[in-house]
Amino acid sequence: MAAVVALGANVLSAKSIICDIEGTTTSISFVKDTLFPYALKHVEGYLKNNWNEEATKTVVTALREQAEEDKKAEVEGVVPIPTGDSEDIIPEIVKNVEWQMSLDRKTGSLKTLQGLVWAKGYKDGSIKGHVYDDVQKAFEQWTENGRKIYIYSSGSVDAQKLLFEHSEQGDLLKYLSGHYDTKIGAKREKESYTSILKNIESSPEEALFLTDVYAEAKAAKEAGLNVVLLDRPGNSELSEEERKDFPVIATFSDLSFAAETKEENGGATNGKRKIEETNDDVAEEDKAQVYPNKK
């Protein structure tokens, strides 16, 4: 069992929460053991059944261009993708995808094709996005307390949305205010976090980044963000030195954000208590202003 961790006031008062996915909201094994094998198994069928779709044509062109770049760069083992009829091209695309995935490459064209294949699986119910048991409750509480939640992952924005829309705990997209992938920058570069802050119009002091990767945490800290590391089951072991640099938690329930509302005298009180006090004081006909969703 993880030891109780003291979290600083800046962490617990953060208004913008930026979450990684793998190892943070979602098991690393889900991507490795479910999503990747599904893409490998179904990519050929997807291409055959959707060959004339514009999205397919676009991604095939992108894969071919990537293969040409790899060939020029003398990347070992590259599988070229020819032009011609689908029956000639599809087997080579499959080989190219298998080669890239065997190297754990994250090229844009590969991620796009994976996303197209996964979309079909999510929508027909073959895939349900894994999220840890504490995620839905935490997302709900954080948003109710006035926090905004953003996702920053190496997976494409489309793939992120599919995972959270079709999660094991239902549609979680309603809790999310934005999504970012590596188009905004690499996750181990300080500038990426600065760009996200600018995009969401947040100061670094009011932002919190949650991740399981020390190098990402370090980059975010260099950009001025508050950072907490996640120690989930199956994650890479954090060293003692890494644990000294950042607070480490095992679950989102270890983060307790207090909902605060300003009183007329300038003080602050817990949001739940404030509503209860107000409810006692207002006339019956005015209660809809306190509980706007109640008739």
Swiss-Prot record:
Its Gene Ontology molecular function terms?
acireductone synthase activity; magnesium ion binding
Q: How is the cofactor bound?
A: Binds 1 Mg(2+) ion per subunit.
Which leading EC class covers this enzyme? hydrolase
What EC number(s) does its UniProt record assign? 3.1.3.77
Provide one Gene Ontology cellular component: nucleus
The UniProt entry lists the main location of this chain as cytoplasm
Q: Which domain of life is it from?
A: Eukaryota
Pathway stated in the Swiss-Prot or TrEMBL entry: Amino-acid biosynthesis; L-methionine biosynthesis via salvage pathway; L-methionine from S-methyl-5-thio-alpha-D-ribose 1-phosphate: step 3/6; Amino-acid biosynthesis; L-methionine biosynthesis via salvage pathway; L-methionine from S-methyl-5-thio-alpha-D-ribose 1-phosphate: step 4/6
A GO biological-process term: L-methionine salvage from methylthioadenosine
Chain residues that bind Mg(2+)? D20, E22, D212
Q: Record's CDD domains?
A: HAD_EP
**What SUPFAM superfamilies does the record point to?**
HAD-like (SSF56784)
Q: Which reaction does it catalyse?
A: 5-methylsulfanyl-2,3-dioxopentyl phosphate + H2O = 1,2-dihydroxy-5-(methylsulfanyl)pent-1-en-3-one + phosphate
Q: Tell me which cofactor or cofactors this protein depends on.
A: Mg(2+)
Alphabetized, the UniProt keywords read:
Amino-acid biosynthesis, Cytoplasm, Hydrolase, Magnesium, Metal-binding, Methionine biosynthesis, Nucleus
Q: Where in the cell is it found?
A: Cytoplasm; Nucleus
Q: Which residues bind substrate?
A: S153, S154, K187
Disordered, as annotated region:
260-295
Give a short account of what the protein does.
Bifunctional enzyme that catalyzes the enolization of 2,3-diketo-5-methylthiopentyl-1-phosphate (DK-MTP-1-P) into the intermediate 2-hydroxy-3-keto-5-methylthiopentenyl-1-phosphate (HK-MTPenyl-1-P), which is then dephosphorylated to form the acireductone 1,2-dihydroxy-3-keto-5-methylthiopentene (DHK-MTPene).
Description of how the protein assembles with itself and partners:
Monomer.
Checking NCBIfam families in the record gives: enolase-ppase, HAD-SF-IA-v1
Similarity remark: Belongs to the HAD-like hydrolase superfamily. MasA/MtnC family.
User: What's the protein here called?
Assistant: Enolase-phosphatase E1
Which species?
Anopheles gambiae
